């Protein structure tokens, strides 16, 4: 029987990241080492109140990007100022876990982020205090699955990475070892001067 397929970033985690994190933080057990539990992609579509097809197009793009069917999100309550009624479709989201999560992470770090215009690294302060990281993207065209001709409107999206890390420092180190391009601390001090 052939060996089961293991994503490249899963192998990276098992073979190198666990050792590096154990050395740096002094974990006594390899099960203490933080890991990524899920990645949530979320795209809000503001124009959806006028045109329902915009949400379907956004969900189709999210499905292509994630490799998993997107769920259309609906408004929880009515807001008159936005002409929004409870239950109206207003966006799309995808929750990735296990192999698909590692595959997306690989494509996000190695292919998509380098294609962002004027990219100077991810914001190292976007952690929530519990070891989770959130970042926003201004356009969906940075993913190779989306062709420029098929896009009706450039939309941004949120990428949320949930980890089992107890502190932001542990999560920052985990994501840095996965290849997330955080600017170095000494560069931040140079810019402040």
Curated annotation (Swiss-Prot):
One of its GO terms (biological process) is translation. GO terms for molecular function: rRNA binding; structural constituent of ribosome; tRNA binding. The keyword Repeat does not apply. It holds the Pfam family Ribosomal_L5_C. Keywords: Ribonucleoprotein, Ribosomal protein, RNA-binding, rRNA-binding, tRNA-binding. InterPro entries: Ribosomal_uL5 (IPR002132), Ribosomal_uL5_bac-type (IPR020930), Ribosomal_uL5_C (IPR031309), Ribosomal_uL5_CS (IPR020929), Ribosomal_uL5_dom_sf (IPR022803), Ribosomal_uL5_N (IPR031310). The keyword Nucleus does not apply. One of its GO terms (cellular component) is ribonucleoprotein complex. NCBIfam families: PRK00010.1. Belongs to the universal ribosomal protein uL5 family. Part of the 50S ribosomal subunit; part of the 5S rRNA/L5/L18/L25 subcomplex. Contacts the 5S rRNA and the P site tRNA. Forms a bridge to the 30S subunit in the 70S ribosome. This is Large ribosomal subunit protein uL5.
